[in-house]
Amino acid sequence: VGLVVAAVIVASVWSLTRDSLRLSLDGVPVGIRIDEVEKTMEAVPGVKAVHHIHVWAISTTENALTAHVVLAELPRMETVKRQLKAELETAGIHHVTLEFESSAEHCPGTCD
């Protein structure tokens, strides 16, 4: 009986330790694929490209994203931003920070 209890405790501790380590190292959350997030974002009308994407867990239930978004037309920025945030929320990403660029100001290779 004691070994069974010890095994249950070890299994619980391992799961908690793994999740805590992933959170503390800002790892990509389980179930989130960066390539799928990029495809979802680029499918929004008005988005020409997406780059410099970072996704991390804020907690065990909340995820965050930052990304650079290249727009076909800057005047549509607010509309595109609302659509992107709605799509990302559906994908389980609730805290979103986006930096918008025109295709003329695109920063490949120079983004920090």
What spans do the regions from the language model cover?
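Alpha-helical transmembrane segments and adjacent TM-loop junctions that form the membrane-embedded core
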Residues: V1-D112
